[in-house]
């Protein structure tokens, strides 16, 4: 039973988001005092709130999930978990995560994570995902909140750098999500989800993805230009952004779009891990680098 309740929190999504939380935290910690305990508390708090959002998403997406091969065996679709119990579970996760951030980290982090939760649950899950081709864009707003909360956990104020970080992860979400939609396009068609590749076609989605990847690279380098990140960050971010751009700009059609979109997706993960990793490493004094 414990395994079933764990599965509806979508641990993979939580882990991916916590990497971006750490990225924001590490970036802020370059100029503000921080501690490992603060990082751990922030990760736990944000993780609980994300888990709650994923549970609610599972509850409301039962009708969609049963139409998709990838999701038709989820616990709530199969009736293995009571819906009312899942709602209570989501509420407990949300209250504990928010309270932890509010009391131990700072109130601003708690407020921002709640705003992200509202966007994900009420705007994205309940409406835009089902009814609009712009659902991915709305979802990108909530998806960019975790790194922002990581940053605010250290600074407790919104700065130009924090705003740039938020915009950067909004931009990252778009080609990342479109890539997923492309290699799972039949599932999205079966469920009637109006994502851009399904509604407007592969060529249109490809154009959008190229634009977002380029914009992401510009903003990523912008963090260095503001003096918030070091030369190690510049080298790594430039390298991963170049690789992501190179893959994204490859020719794509109906014969190779599945393989191509999987490559774009994998590169998007490498980009986040590379940027997050180098921001963490820059906090460590390395005499042979500095």
Curated annotation (Swiss-Prot):
Q: Which GO terms describe its cellular component?
A: plasma membrane
State the function annotated in the UniProt record.
Converts heme B (protoheme IX) to heme O by substitution of the vinyl group on carbon 2 of heme B porphyrin ring with a hydroxyethyl farnesyl side group.
Which superkingdom? Bacteria
Q: Other notes on this protein?
A: Carbon 2 of the heme B porphyrin ring is defined according to the Fischer nomenclature.
Q: Name one Pfam family in it.
A: UbiA
Record's keyword annotation contains Membrane: yes
Which chemical reaction does it catalyze?
Answer: heme b + (2E,6E)-farnesyl diphosphate + H2O = Fe(II)-heme o + diphosphate
Q: Which organism is it from?
A: Vibrio campbellii (strain ATCC BAA-1116)
The protein's GO terms of the molecular function aspect are: protoheme IX farnesyltransferase activity
Q: What is its main location?
A: membrane
The top EC class is transferase
Q: What is this protein called?
A: Protoheme IX farnesyltransferase 1
Question: Member of which family?
Answer: Belongs to the UbiA prenyltransferase family. Protoheme IX farnesyltransferase subfamily.
InterPro entries for the chain: Protohaem_IX_farnesylTrfase, UbiA_prenyltransferase, UbiA_prenylTrfase_CS, UbiA_sf
**Which stretches are transmembrane?**
8-28, 36-56, 85-105, 108-128, 131-151, 152-172, 211-231, 269-289
Keyword set includes GTP-binding? no
User: PANTHER family of this UniProt entry?
Assistant: PROTOHEME IX FARNESYLTRANSFERASE, MITOCHONDRIAL
Q: Which gene encodes it?
A: cyoE1
Q: Which EC number(s) does the record attach to this protein?
A: 2.5.1.141
Q: Which UniProt keywords apply?
A: Cell inner membrane, Cell membrane, Heme biosynthesis, Membrane, Transferase, Transmembrane, Transmembrane helix
Q: In which pathway does it act?
A: Porphyrin-containing compound metabolism; heme O biosynthesis; heme O from protoheme: step 1/1
């Amino acid at each position: 039973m414990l395994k079933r309740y764990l599965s509806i929190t979508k641990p993979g999504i939580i882990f991916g988001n916590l990497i971006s939380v750490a990225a924001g935290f590490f970036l802020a910690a370059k100029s503000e005092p921080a501690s490992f305990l603060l990082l751990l508390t922030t990760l736990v708090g944000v993780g609980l709130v994300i888990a709650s959002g994923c549970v609610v998403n599972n509850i409301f997406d039962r009708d969609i999930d049963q139409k998709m091969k990838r999701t038709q065996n989820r616990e709530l679709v199969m009736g293995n978990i009571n819906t009312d119990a899942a709602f209570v579970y989501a509420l407990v996760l949300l209250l504990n995560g928010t309270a932890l951030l509010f009391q131990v980290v700072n109130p601003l982090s708690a407020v921002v994570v709640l705003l992200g939760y509202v966007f994900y649950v009420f705007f994205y899950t309940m409406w835009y995902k089902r009814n609009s081709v712009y659902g991915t864009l709305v979802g990108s707003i909530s998806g960019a909140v975790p790194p922002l909360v990581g940053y605010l956990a250290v600074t407790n104020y919104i700065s130009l750098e924090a705003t740039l970080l938020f915009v950067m992860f909004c931009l990252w979400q778009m080609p990342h999500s479109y890539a997923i939609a492309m290699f799972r396009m039949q599932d999205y068609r079966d469920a009637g989800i109006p994502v851009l590749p399904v509604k407007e076609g592969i060529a249109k989605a490809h154009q959008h993805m190229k634009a977002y990847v380029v914009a992401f690279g510009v903003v990523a380098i912008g963090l260095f230009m503001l003096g918030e990140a070091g030369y190690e960050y510049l080298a790594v971010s430039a390298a991963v952004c170049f690789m992501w751009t190179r893959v994204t700009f490859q020719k794509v059609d109906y014969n190779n779009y599945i393989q191509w979109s999987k490559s774009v997706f994998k590169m998007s993960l490498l980009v986040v891990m590379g940027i997050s990793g180098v921001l963490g490493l820059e906090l460590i004094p390395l005499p042979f680098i500095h």
